[in-house]
Amino acid sequence: MHITTLDIPGLFLITPTPRADVRGVFQKTFDAALFATHGMNTDLHEVFETESHKEVIRGMHFQMPPHACAKYVSVKHGSILDVVLDIRMNSPTFGKHLSIQLSAENQSTLYIPEGFAHGFKALTELAHTSYLQTAGFNAACDAGIHFDSFGMDWGVDNPIMSERDKALPAFTSFISPFSHQE
């Protein structure tokens, strides 16, 4: 397993090391002890899965405190452009975003800590995405930021989106409850 530190502190790309033989493939995709040495929260509470069609955009979502959560995002079928936005006040990367392709082929997982908004665009006809979360869903703390309000070029003119996501507030009007901690 290989862990890559990404350009925004706190984000990690986790890539398994598959071992193949005549039976097929075996690989480790989660290692709580190893992840904890990198400061990742490994106290998992819920797993969600989505199936999305090409040019669907979901996001940008997060949960507010006291039910904020970290996520481990991976793709089981197809491919997505995964996007994260730093919404931690006083962070040197506050307001910066990062995008990375996750796919069934590369088998990578993106670790997203608390204090980030998350979304993605489906790149294939069908993308099956899995989220492991460190807190249970809480409707009262469910929040988001409008997908095109922070400078991300999504590369699609008419994305397929939920009415909820279309109505999310702009990043410029968002007052973050998250703070950066060294």
In which residue ranges do the predicted regions lie?
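Extended, polar beta-sheet/loop recognition surfaces of beta-rich domains
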Residues: 133
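Non-catalytic, conserved peripheral segments adjacent to functional cores
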Residues: 1-105, 124-126, 136-182
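Conserved metal-binding segment of the jelly-roll/cupin
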Residues: 102-124
